[in-house]
């Protein structure tokens, strides 16, 4: 895509319908997320940008532990916390008693002091990767991994790019 602005999925629906159509496919089988409300931010699940504090290198290592090798190198934006903290951000930290489709009413204020908590990949995630690999199904990379959600768009022009 041309440009340097990172938009939430729903913002692409009218401005870039072909890109929206490509990325909305990620929700096949989980369509209820497309209309799920994030009450603290007064918006929908796809009205926000989704971030993780987990490094792309660690994601690859955890996938490899599950027997999944990613043969391509991908680029990821490293977004400074200062850009996403504040009233337009929230953390979604999965609770152990939740199903594959989480209770989207359980959020906590995004706290930069808790980055170590947000960086932790739960053992359940690695087990999930193993189960999906064994069944020949593609895993959701961020299943049970804490999410940092930001209501807004971000200019990526001056952001560091991390390859993994």
Segments and roles (model prediction):
Residues 1-50, 56-164:
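Active-site-proximal loop/hinge segments that shape catalytic or ion-binding/gating pockets
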């Amino acid at each position: 895509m041309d440009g340097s602005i990172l938009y939430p999925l729903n913002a692409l629906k009218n401005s870039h319908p072909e890109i929206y159509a490509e990325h909305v496919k990620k929700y096949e089988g989980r369509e209820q997320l497309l209309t799920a409300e994030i009450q603290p931010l007064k918006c929908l699940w796809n009205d926000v940008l989704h971030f993780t504090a987990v490094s792309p290198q660690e994601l690859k290592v955890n996938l490899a532990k599950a027997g999944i090798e990613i043969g391509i190198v991908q680029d990821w934006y490293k977004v400074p916390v200062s850009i996403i903290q504040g009233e337009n951000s929230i953390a979604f930290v999965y609770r152990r008693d939740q199903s594959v489709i989480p209770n989207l009413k359980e959020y906590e204020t995004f706290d930069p002091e808790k980055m170590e908590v947000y960086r932790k990949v739960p053992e359940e995630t690695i087990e999930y990767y193993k189960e999906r690999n064994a069944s020949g199904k593609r895993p959701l990379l961020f299943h049970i991994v804490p999410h940092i959600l930001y209501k807004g768009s971000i200019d990526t022009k001056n952001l560091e790019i991390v390859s993994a």
